[in-house]
């Protein structure tokens, strides 16, 4: 009975990368860490929690001992590197030379470089940090790993941070050892090849949303253009022509007029490249020729453009809710009531305007709901739970429905304003007429592609048929047309 009571309540088991429990070896290898910064402390915490024996080497162990877990041994650097076979080098590149005095003790051991250069250092040095470390310690095996994992992710665990650990080294056995450690810590190792790949791996943390740069600049450019256009029509024109001060509209009213224009055009730009790609395939008669680079990049940025469209649409909805809260709106209501009294009208009701408002608000809510569905299904956790047909239906079919609803929302908002002369201020057409051009072209093109003569040809091309091919090809059930040829 006493023997049972001496057993620990929690066994030395770890959560593996797939969520299952993985056994740690009974005699876990001793791991050394050189450095006492934030990353070194987080790494030590994670290693201790995973059942490893951790020795931390510091220049001043008495000062830094209280910052590390109690189970981690904090000592001088010479003692920390004496027994472990795997040593994490958690110091900056400029401090590598201070470790040269340990070269004899480090010989034959695995050095794991976890550092990242600054943008200036990355451009200045041709060698990666890991390659530079390997040149200083030729008798050691250098592995680049854990540099894309943040200190917070190490402390919080892989469930709340990035799970992938990118690993590169010239020695397969060393990569295997570090991969096993990463799995024991609950992460997913990913082999990136030899140590020559370390420069590319070190560049990853330096990137700031690379796939969002062009879509964001596009959205900002559209916002500036539409805001300037609306400012000229709604603020500048009344000031010049009628001497009316409408500058109070700039912070909210003009912004709210601009937001739906940007959202609508961005949504159109999500589906325009698909139309261009289909037209190009029909013209070429094959799918095996590459698209132009500009079209290829455009197709790859559709997700980001769509999410920005949803963002601007949500802002438009929030701004619209704020419109009745403005002091200027309250003054307009009072002035309208005074005019009604002076005109001796007991009831003001315009049936056409009432119906128009009800319809276009309803269509706007439906369009925003569709965009919300598209945004949710673009999340990796949701997208991974859908098969390709389900994902394609939501993003392609329902997305096109959202474009149609947005077009109907815009048309009912504009109503007959496009044909009324007083709405052409400075001879500039209403803003909504400009936004309608591109979506209407896309909807018309999509409708043309649904015609049997184009639809069947496009389907054949995407199944491998070629206009000037050499292999007989016929779609299932296509008995009425002659045989075609293909290189399938």
Swiss-Prot record:
Binding site for FAD: 152, 160, 281, 302-303, 378, 395
Pfam families: F420_oxidored, Ferric_reduct
Knockout consequences: Mice display iron deficiency anemia, due to a defect in iron release through the transferrin cycle.
Domain Ferric oxidoreductase: 259-407
GO BP: any one term: apoptotic process
Site for Cleavage, residues: 325-326
Catalytic activity: 2 Fe(2+) + NADP(+) + H(+) = 2 Fe(3+) + NADPH; 2 Cu(+) + NADP(+) + H(+) = 2 Cu(2+) + NADPH
EC number: 1.16.1.-
Cytoplasmic side: 1-207, 280-304, 380-390, 455-488
Names of required cofactors: FAD; heme b
Taxonomy, superkingdom: Eukaryota
Compartment(s): Endosome membrane
Gene3D superfamilies: NAD(P)-binding Rossmann-like Domain
Tissues with expression: Highly expressed in fetal liver (the site of midgestational hematopoiesis).
Post-translational modifications reported in the UniProt record: Proteolytically cleaved by RHBDL4/RHBDD1. RHBDL4/RHBDD1-induced cleavage occurs at multiple sites in a glycosylation-independent manner. Glycosylated.
GO molecular function, one term: heme binding
InterPro entries per record: Fe3_Rdtase_TM_dom, NAD(P)-bd_dom_sf, P5C_Rdtase_cat_N, STEAP_metalloreductase
Gene Ontology cellular component annotations, sorted alphabetically: endosome; endosome membrane; multivesicular body; plasma membrane
Disorder: Defects in Steap3 are the cause of fragile-red phenotype characterized by hypochromic microcytic anemia.
Function according to Swiss-Prot or TrEMBL: Integral membrane protein that functions as a NADPH-dependent ferric-chelate reductase, using NADPH from one side of the membrane to reduce a Fe(3+) chelate that is bound on the other side of the membrane. Mediates sequential transmembrane electron transfer from NADPH to FAD and onto heme, and finally to the Fe(3+) chelate. Can also reduce Cu(2+) to Cu(1+). Mediates efficient transferrin-dependent iron uptake in erythroid cells. May play a role downstream of p53/TP53 to interface apoptosis and cell cycle progression.
PANTHER family, per the entry: DUDULIN-RELATED, METALLOREDUCTASE STEAP3
Assembly and binders: Homodimer. Interacts with BNIP3L, MYT1, RHBDL4/RHBDD1 and TCTP.
Protein name: Metalloreductase STEAP3
Organismal lineage: Eukaryota, Metazoa, Chordata, Craniata, Vertebrata
């Amino acid at each position: 009975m006493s023997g049972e009571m001496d057993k620990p309540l929690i066994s030395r088991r770890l959560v593996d990368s797939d969520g299952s429990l993985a056994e740690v070896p009974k005699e876990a290898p001793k791991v050394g860490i050189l450095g006492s910064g934030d990353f070194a402390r987080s790494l030590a915490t994670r290693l201790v929690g995973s059942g490893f024996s951790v020795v931390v080497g510091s220049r001043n162990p008495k000062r830094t001992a209280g910052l590390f877990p109690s189970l981690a041994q904090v000592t001088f650097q010479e003692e920390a590197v004496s027994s472990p076979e795997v040593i994490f080098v958690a110091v900056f590149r400029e401090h590598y030379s201070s470790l040269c005095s340990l070269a004899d003790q480090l010989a034959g051991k695995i050095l794991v470089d976890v550092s990242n250069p600054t943008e200036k250092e990355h451009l200045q040095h041709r060698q990666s940090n890991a390659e530079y470390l390997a040149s200083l310690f030729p008798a050691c095996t250098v592995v680049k790993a854990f540099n894309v994992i943040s200190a917070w992710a190490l402390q919080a665990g892989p469930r709340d941070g990035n799970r992938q650990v990118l690993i590169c080294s010239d020695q397969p056995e060393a990569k295997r050892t570090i991969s096993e450690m990463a799995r024991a810590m609950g992460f997913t190792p990913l082999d990136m090849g030899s140590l020559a790949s370390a420069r590319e791996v070190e560049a990853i943390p330096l990137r700031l949303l690379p796939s969002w740069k062009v879509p964001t600049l596009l959205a900002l450019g559209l916002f500036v253009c539409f805001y300037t256009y609306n400012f000229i029509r709604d603020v500048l024109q009344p000031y010049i022509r009628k001497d009316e001060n409408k500058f109070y509209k700039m912070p909210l009213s003009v912004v709210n007029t601009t937001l739906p224009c940007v959202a609508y055009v961005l949504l159109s730009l999500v589906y325009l490249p698909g139309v261009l790609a289909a037209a190009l395939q029909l013209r070429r008669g094959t799918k095996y020729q590459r698209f132009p680079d500009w079209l290829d990049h455009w197709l790859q940025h559709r997700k980001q453009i769509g999410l920005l469209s949803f963002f601007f649409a949500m802002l438009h909805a929030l701004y619209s809710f704020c419109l009745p809260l403005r002091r200027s709106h309250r003054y307009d209501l009072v002035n309208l009531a005074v005019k009604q009294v002076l005109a001796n009208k007991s009831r003001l009701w315009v049936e056409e305007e009432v119906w128009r408002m009800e319809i276009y608000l309803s269509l706007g809510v439906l369009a925003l709901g569709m965009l919300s569905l598209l945004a949710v299904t673009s999340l990796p956790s949701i997208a991974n739970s859908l098969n390709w047909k389900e994902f394609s239906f939501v993003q392609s079919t329902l997305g096109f429905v959202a474009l149609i609803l947005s077009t109907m929302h815009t048309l009912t908002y504009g109503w007959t304003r496009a044909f009324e002369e007083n709405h052409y201020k400075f001879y500039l057409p209403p803003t909504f007429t400009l936004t309608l051009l591109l979506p209407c072209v896309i909807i018309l093109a999509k409708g043309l592609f649904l015609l049997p003569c184009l639809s069947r040809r496009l389907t054949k091309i995407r199944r491998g048929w070629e206009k000037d091919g050499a292999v007989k090809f016929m779609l299932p059930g296509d008995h009425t047309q002659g045989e075609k040829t293909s290189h399938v």
